[in-house]
Amino acid sequence: MVLVSRVTVYNVRYLYTEIGKILGLDTVHPMIILGAGNLGQALANYVDFEKRGFKLVGIFDVNPVLEGIAVRGIEIQMLSDLPLFLKENEVEIAILTLPKNKAKEMAKILIDNGIKAIWNFAHIDLDAPEDVMVENVHLSESLMTLSYNLSEYRKEHEGM
């Protein structure tokens, strides 16, 4: 008996490059962070963003104590400086890590100044015009999903 299997050989580097193009990772995406608290600074310090073409160009906060402090070489600026910064710099993506009472106001400023992509970690869902992409991130929902999966795993493996 002869078994014949079909073997497909893939050029992994080529596939990686092509998938990167589909995801838009073949260009640099300048981005800013609004909110320089714990989450904002953690995101600012995440070096893998740059490896994927996301370049941090500005960090903003409302707290004057943080003004001028550098995070990875970028000085924290005041939120009041944001409109001028957006006029003078190319920014594609804004990351919101602000309290919910500031998020909607800042989102409006971002949208009014041409930002087309917002990654929102504020504890409020943002609505935006059709030409603006918003990714509302809910950390607690992700944690609940993990909890559910853990619970299901335990049920399946009880008594083993």
Which residues are covered by each model-predicted region?
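Short secondary-structure boundary segments
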Residues: 98, 121-123
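Hydrophobic, well-ordered beta-alpha structural blocks that scaffold small-molecule cofactor pockets
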Residues: 1-97, 102-113, 129-154, 160
